[in-house]
């Protein structure tokens, strides 16, 4: 398995033609700010780096597609030795993250704890009331100070998003169908925890495992993993989940990210000019990939 976070820098002119025009939504680039587009571009570069270096597919032969619900996948005609190879990306706050599995179904989400853009934390919780079950709200509100409550809110949110992204159903999934029994309540930076359990429609989902991490003081990462039917991989529930592990994310620099990159198209100065010309638009905290 592979877990890769990337601290997001500003992109240079040469980056854009490395990604390739078919993998960049030009309309999206125009609509949003550079700070939002940069992690989205980073996510695409992370996928290409992963596929090129782990599956030995030449960078310029990599063909990516999206499912009907928008999840990025390798094209079926790719020279892929792992037919169940699965990956997922997320970006929010200061990081873009990627999780990949050779056989297991996987989803990843990252959330940064920050104050709501408008109103108080209790007002924000009231607006989001229907996103969590009563038991989840009890856990969130069990802490005395509001900042720690907000921490737990975003940790719960990352868990739900990781599951939804793993199954690839998009925005139509009713979040209250999911209930997480979170354990432990406090996470140490750099540790990986696998004790949290998922209940779907009141029934425990034992085929699913959740890896929780804190990259730093403000960023939670949740990885959802499920064994597909017919897989020879060991059962995910057979692992010892009683203790945190030291398996940390591999931190990439920008130079790491593009170390194996090759240009996909001739450099187009007008494309870069268009990229830089876009007016910056304030982005709400919940913007995701």
Where are these regions (language model features)?
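Core catalytic alpha/beta fold that binds nucleotide/phospho-ligands
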Residues: 1-289
């Amino acid at each position: 398995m592979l877990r890769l976070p990337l601290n997001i820098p500003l992109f240079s002119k040469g980056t854009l033609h490395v990604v390739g025009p078919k993998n960049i939504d030009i309309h999206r680039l125009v609509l949003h700010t550079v700070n939002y587009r940069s992690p989205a571009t980073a996510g695409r570069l992370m996928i290409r780096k992963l596929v090129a270096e782990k599956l030995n597919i030449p960078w310029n032969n990599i063909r990516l597609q999206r499912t009907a619900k928008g999840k990025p996948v390798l094209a079926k005609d790719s020279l892929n030795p792992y037919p169940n190879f699965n990956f997922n990306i997320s970006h929010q706050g200061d990081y873009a993250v990627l999780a990949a599995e050779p056989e297991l179904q996987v989803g990843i989400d990252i959330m940064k704890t920050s104050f709501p853009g408008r109103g108080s934390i209790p007002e924000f919780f009231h607006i989001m009331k229907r996103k969590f079950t009563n038991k989840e709200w009890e856990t969130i509100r069990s802490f005395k100070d509001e900042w720690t409550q907000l921490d737990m809110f975003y940790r719960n949110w990352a868990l739900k998003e990781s599951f939804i992204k793993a199954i690839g159903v998009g925005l139509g999934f009713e979040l209250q169908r999911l209930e997480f029994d979170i354990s432990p309540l406090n996470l140490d930076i750099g540790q990986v925890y696998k004790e949290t359990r998922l209940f779907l429609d009141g029934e425990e989902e034992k085929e699913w495992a959740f890896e929780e991490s804190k990259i730093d003081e403000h960023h939670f990462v949740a990885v959802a993993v499920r064994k597909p039917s017919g897989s020879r991989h060991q059962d995910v529930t057979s692992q010892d989940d009683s203790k945190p592990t030291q398996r940390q994310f591999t931190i990439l620099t920008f130079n790491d990210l593009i170390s194996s990159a090759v240009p996909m198209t001739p450099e187009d100065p007008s494309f870069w000019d268009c990229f830089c010309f876009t007016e910056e638009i304030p982005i709400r905290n919940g913007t995701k990939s």
